[in-house]
């Protein structure tokens, strides 16, 4: 019934109203393909972008292989074509920190982004990496400008998305001047990256 509701929402309000469907704890290509299949079974005329979320260290290591298998499947390429060959991939910071500690997690995140970018470029896919960062250092927090500029070469390409967790919303957005400055810093870092 969720996919029927999505289909109805698209019919009434347009497909741009809803964002991507994020698949938490993506372990295999089948996790992504299941969403595509359910949407087709529900009769969705337009299927939202499907965004795999790689959270654990093992899943970050498997992410390039999973994306490679998706990008070579005809049915998934058709889906990507309907989204202008754009693929959003989300990476999580909390679970990877729990798995391997701060240094291991950050190195795994960095390597995953390099390899995900390479796979997307190989298949001419416009990649957006969606960063599931938290407010604390252990959850990927810290100065957004520095974090964006520290991403692997070619992984941003003017396309960047991040979460702003609840605990830092008030810190960054309660004062219009601070909010403006924070957004300026994010935009500046994306342009410079």
Task: Place the predicted regions along the sequence by residue.
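Short, flexible turn/loop "capping" segments at secondary-structure junctions
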Residues: 13-15, 44
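Catalytic beta/alpha-barrel core
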Residues: 20-26, 51-55
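Active-site-adjacent beta->alpha loops and helix N-cap segments on the catalytic face
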Residues: 27-35
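Extended, charge-enriched "interface" segments that sit outside catalytic cores
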Residues: 1-11
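Short coil/turn segments at secondary-structure boundaries
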Residues: 16-23, 80-83
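Short alpha-helical segments and helix-capping/turn motifs at coil-helix boundaries
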Residues: 7, 34-38
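Catalytic or ion-translocation cores adjacent to nucleophile or general acid/base/metal-coordination motifs
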Residues: 40-193
